[in-house]
Amino acid sequence: MKMKAKWLPIAAAVTAALASQAAFAVDFHGYFRSGVGVSSDGDMQTLSKQKVGRLGNEDDTYGEVQLGQEVFNKDGKTFYVDSMFAMIPNGSNDWEGTGSVCNFDEKQCSGDSEFALRQFNVQAKGLLGFAPEATLWAGKRYYQRHDIHISDFYYWNISGAGAGIEGVQAGPGKISFAWVRNDRGWDGKDGWTKFEGMDVNTLDLRYAGIPLWQDASLEVGVDYAIANPTDAQKDSSNVQYKNAKDGVMLTAELTQGIFGGFNKTVLQYGTEGYSKTMAFYGDGSWYGAEAKDGADGFRIINHGVIPMGNSWEMGHQLVYGVGNDMWDGNDKWETMSVVARPMYKWDDFNKTIFEGGYFKDKNKSTNGSSLEDSGYKLTLSQTWSAGSSFWARPEIRVFTSYAALDDNDMAGTPYNSKTSKDTWNFGVQAEAWW
């Protein structure tokens, strides 16, 4: 009886918590893609999806789980706590964790899976007297990301740990300001010493929702990357730290509604480390602080999803980017890519999708010589989805793909155990978001 009496208060507290409406108010969101596939030489072999499209060109399992809850709401003031973690297993086995797998050779030890903390932040509204509609936030966050879905290409995305004020009404549009940390980490290249990442802070200012003509709006923004090496890094023999310069990235995005779909045209210009963002399909969250003093670049992007009658929809991407004088000996790096994904709807749940993509990269040196890579990917997929829309998910796809390089001065022969310029893939993939 004493034991029973001891547990009664605890049981009552648990019951009260479960009965509370707030206990069930957790927002649950997420994303995943996963599947299985083979190629002409073992498991799937891919070609840069940002350049030629992602359909039938992804060999990973990737998942995000997001949990959030409004923890306070009183007198027009709210506080919301948001969180997200992500996992990337390689998909080769049942049990895939972060522990080491050595394959009988200590020099080949690696984990089956990577775990990442993507978001943990607080978002508050109603606290700013001059802008009660605005959101005051701090923590690690996905911040106003701009991307092209068919290629998984994020072209404006400074997400990370930071703070800011978002959505201040100013005339016809809204202003947002953020301070986010985007360190330049070591990748074994460009003269950086191992484990010596450099502190980089990004200041981001945006004005969004500017109305133009019918169904058209404009968003403009500026990002300023502040290179912040330590005194020890400045005094080191590594000239990359001494030469690191602050950089500016300017972005303008025009959105036009078309037949229930949309088309976006994006113009971007970057100086110093942002020159590499323009040339190498960067998003602004990675700053190439080691770029040569005076480097710059620009990028033009057009993308969208447009309905074509009752049975057809098409997604598309056009990208042209240039980086100038990014390192000693570099004159100009040019990149171009085009992707199209037409889709035919047989009924509300059954689709046939084709995706074709082509890219070309050219690296011109100051001595007049140049190196070129170019290639393409073709995919045909039979798809079943929860609805007929281009964006309907979950979706299950059976696909076959062919990928090939035309020019391969820099890429070499990446397929079939480094002996071939082309490959084919066959597989099944699921994708969902909620």
Curated annotation (Swiss-Prot):
The keyword Membrane applies. Belongs to the porin LamB (TC 1.B.3) family. Residues 1-25 form the signal peptide. It is found in: Cell outer membrane. The record marks Y154 as: Important in sugar transport. The record marks Y31, Y62, W95, F262, W391, W433 as: Greasy slide, important in sugar transport. It is a multi-pass membrane protein. It comes from Aeromonas hydrophila. Transmembrane segments: none annotated. HAMAP family: LamB. One of its GO terms (molecular function) is maltodextrin transmembrane transporter activity. This is Maltoporin. GO terms for cellular component: cell outer membrane; pore complex. It holds the Pfam family LamB. Keywords: Cell outer membrane, Ion transport, Membrane, Porin, Signal, Sugar transport, Transmembrane, Transmembrane beta strand, Transport. It comes from the Bacteria. Its main location: membrane.
